[in-house]
A protein has these predicted regions:
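Hydrophobic alpha-helical membrane segments
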Residues: 13, 19-293
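Serine residues within intrinsically disordered or low-complexity segments
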Residues: 5-7, 17
Length: 293
């Protein structure tokens, strides 16, 4: 049941927990300025550089887990998608551990699977919802180009110039990217809300979307800074290859550099959650409060 009370300048939404299956911690939505997006990027890079071996190893384990899951016949792609929220939470837990000065051990990657039956079940539901949403998105793109883009993304294959030049393929790609934005916002904070706050899966999607909307300026800056850093890294590799007079160097170096950049990016995701939600100091667990300015 929802209770709405107006208390200027804030509106307080209180969810009374009718089901005793979840212990839901009271939390507050924290609105941050746009410049915080830069802080999130810097924090992710700093934590990665403090523990580069641990964070890069965990990221490679993360990638290997999803790659292995995708190898299963027929259900591989869906299984990998369903595991993404839980494994992403593992990387966030590793960042949290590293930010306190501790060394994140490999088993932290499966934190979501060791949080008890109730939260494990909630995380699995979240994974199924993500897989269903992503596959539905791919279904929409298949209506445009006959499934070329979806097959390439989910199954793999060779990209040909002829394929890329097709207008239907290009439209399917752009439609997929446009539809993926709201899907990613729904699930951006959801794994952490389920794991650390005990929020039920569907409600975690709502809270995640609202938090992303309220902190949209900071997230936009965050995304733009990361995009700029990725482009800069690729340009530096290309320039270095040109100075060496070895085009082959660029091809060899691009992949590991991109992996390191991705590892840094995933390390920074935890900070977007940490600064967007604040625990209520009272520590009550009977209800969940979301404060919206």
């Amino acid at each position: 049941m929802w209770e709405l009370s107006l208390s200027p300048p804030k509106i307080e939404f209180m969810l009374l927990s009718a089901a005793a299956n979840f212990r839901i911690h009271i939390m507050k939505l924290n609105i941050v300025p746009a410049r915080t997006g830069i802080t999130w990027v810097k924090s992710g890079i700093q934590i990665f550089l403090k523990q580069p071996l641990a964070m890069s190893s965990l990221f490679f384990m993360f990638m290997a887990t999803l790659s292995f899951a995708s190898l299963f016949p027929f259900v591989g792609a869906a299984l990998a998608l369903a595991l993404l929220p839980a494994t992403t939470l593992g990387l966030m837990a590793a960042t949290q551990e590293a930010s306190t000065g501790k060394f994140p051990i490999p088993t932290i990657l499966i934190s979501a699977f060791r949080a008890g039956r109730q939260r494990l079940g909630a995380m699995l539901v979240l994974g199924v919802l993500y897989a269903a949403g992503f596959l539905a998105l791919m279904g929409v793109s298949s209506l445009i180009d006959g499934g070329q883009f979806a097959k390439l993304y989910l199954v793999g294959g060779k990209i040909t110039q002829e394929m890329v030049m097709q207008s239907d393929f290009q439209l399917a790609m752009w439609v997929t990217l446009a539809l993926y934005l709201p899907l990613s916002l729904l699930f951006w904070h959801a794994p952490a809300l389920v794991h650390w706050h005990g929020v039920p899966p569907v409600k975690s999607l709502f809270f995640s979307l609202m938090a992303c909307y309220k902190n949209g300026a900071a997230l936009t800056v965050y995304a733009l800074v990361w995009a700029g850093l990725f482009v800069l890294a690729m340009l530096m590799v290309t320039l270095f290859a040109a100075l060496l007079g070895s085009p082959m160097f660029a091809g060899v170096a691009m992949f590991p550099v991109a992996l390191v950049m991705m590892a840094m990016f995933f390390t920074s995701i935890y900070f977007t959650f940490r600064d967007s939600f604040v625990d209520n100091p009272s520590g009550q667990t009977a209800a969940q409060t979301l404060l919206v300015p």
